[in-house]
Amino acid sequence: MGQFIFVSFGFLVVATSLSGTEAGFCCPLGWSSYDEHCYQVFQQKMNWEDAEKFCTQQHKGSHLVSFHSSEEVDFVTSKTFPILKYDFVWIGLSNVWNECTKEWSDGTKLDYKAWSGGSDCIVSKTTDNQWLSMDCSSKRYVVCKFQA
């Protein structure tokens, strides 16, 4: 009986120490975790529409990356720059449905933005928190994201 209590107490200590960390979820092999989401950088270049479709085929609930804080952008930049160096990646922000406002392809609220201007689709630089408008038919690298 004493051994059972000791082992049970050990599990309680471990569970308590892990609560509040990202230990409660796990991303698939090859994906990186941040704030209860999983991210993967792909080295294929494609247009925005093909990139979004590609992401939806990678994992259930996956879309082109959406950003909701500068910290999240910094995390993605830390993943893209070592692989892609100085380049651009598609992000899920666009106006490809020709509505009045841009929106994230994953349906989340547009609560953070770092771009100005023009075209229907947005890219993010792999080096910093800078977004640019770009023609949707341009071929760019892809970062996919889903909620874990």
UniProtKB/Swiss-Prot annotation:
PROSITE patterns on file: C_TYPE_LECTIN_1, C_TYPE_LECTIN_2
Q: Where is the C-type lectin domain?
A: 34-145
Q: Which GO terms describe its molecular function?
A: toxin activity
Principal location class: secreted
Spell out the subcellular localization from the entry: Secreted
Give UniProt keywords alphabetically. Answer: Disulfide bond, Hemostasis impairing toxin, Platelet aggregation inhibiting toxin, Secreted, Signal, Toxin
Q: Found in which tissues?
A: Expressed by the venom gland.
Q: List the disulfide bonds.
A: 27-38, 55-144, 121-136
Q: Where is the signal peptide?
A: 1-23
Describe, as the record does, how this protein assembles with itself and its partners. Answer: Tetramer of heterodimers of alpha and beta subunits (alphabeta)(4); disulfide-linked.
Q: Which family does it belong to?
A: Belongs to the snaclec family.
Q: What does this protein do?
A: Strong platelet aggregation inhibitor. Binds specifically to platelet glycoprotein Ibalpha (GP1BA) with high affinity and inhibits vWF-dependent platelet aggregation. Has also been observed to induce small agglutinates in washed platelets by binding to GPIb.
**Misc. comment:** Negative results: has no effect on ADP- and collagen-induced platelet aggregation in platelet rich plasma.
Name of the featured protein = Snaclec flavocetin-A subunit beta
Provenance organism: Protobothrops flavoviridis (Habu)
